[in-house]
Amino acid sequence: MKASMFLALAGLVLLFVVGYASESEEKEFPRELLSKVFAVDDFKGEERGCKGFGDSCTPGKNECCPNYACSSKHKWCKVYLGK
C-alpha cells in the first residue's frame, strides 16, 4: 500500500514537471513559428535565374537549372539523365 501511494505521488510530481516544461516551451512557439513563416515568405520573393523540376519551359531555350532539361513533349523541366 505504501509503495503504490509513493508511485502515485511520484507520477503526479512527474506530470506536474512535464506540464510546466511544455507550457514554458509553448510560450516561445508562436514567436518561432511567425519568424519561420516570414523567413520562408521572404525566400519565396526571390526569383531564380533558372527553372526547377516541373516548371513550364520552352523547348530549345536553356531555361532549366543544371541537371534538368526541357521536355519537348510535355514542355516542363525534367531530370536530365543523359543518353
Curated annotation (Swiss-Prot):
Propeptide stretches are 22-48
Top-rank taxon, per record? Eukaryota
Q: In which tissues is it expressed?
A: Expressed by the venom gland.
Leucine amide modification sites? 81
* Keyword field contains Transcription: no
What is the annotated localization of this protein?
Secreted
The SS bond pairs are 50-65, 57-70, 64-77
Write out the coiled-coil annotation as residue ranges. Answer: none
The answer to whether the entry has keyword Disulfide bond is yes
Q: Name one GO cellular component term.
A: host cell presynaptic membrane
Pfam families found in the cross-reference section? Toxin_12 (PF07740)
Instruction: Write out the entry's keywords from A to Z.
Output: Amidation, Disulfide bond, Ion channel impairing toxin, Knottin, Neurotoxin, Presynaptic neurotoxin, Secreted, Signal, Toxin, Voltage-gated sodium channel impairing toxin
**Cleaved signal peptide residues:** 1-21
Q: Which GO terms describe its molecular function?
A: ion channel inhibitor activity; sodium channel regulator activity; toxin activity
The extra comment attached to this record reads:
Negative results: has no activity on Nav1.4, Nav1.5, Nav1.8 and Nav1.9 sodium and calcium currents.
Job of this protein: Selective antagonist of neuronal tetrodotoxin (TTX)-sensitive voltage-gated sodium channels (IC(50)=1270 nM on Nav1.1/SCN1A, 270 nM on Nav1.2/SCN2A, 491 nM on Nav1.3/SCN3A and 232 nM on Nav1.7/SCN9A). This toxin suppress Nav1.7 current amplitude without significantly altering the activation, inactivation, and repriming kinetics. Short extreme depolarizations partially activate the toxin-bound channel, indicating voltage-dependent inhibition of this toxin. This toxin increases the deactivation of the Nav1.7 current after extreme depolarizations.
Q: Domain annotation text?
A: The presence of a 'disulfide through disulfide knot' structurally defines this protein as a knottin.
Q: How does this protein assemble?
A: Monomer.
Family, according to the entry, reads as follows:
Belongs to the neurotoxin 10 (Hwtx-1) family. 15 (Hntx-3) subfamily.
Q: What is this protein called?
A: Hainantoxin-III 7
Q: Which organism is it from?
A: Cyriopagopus hainanus
Q: What broad taxonomic lineage does this protein's source fall under?
A: Eukaryota, Metazoa, Ecdysozoa, Arthropoda, Chelicerata
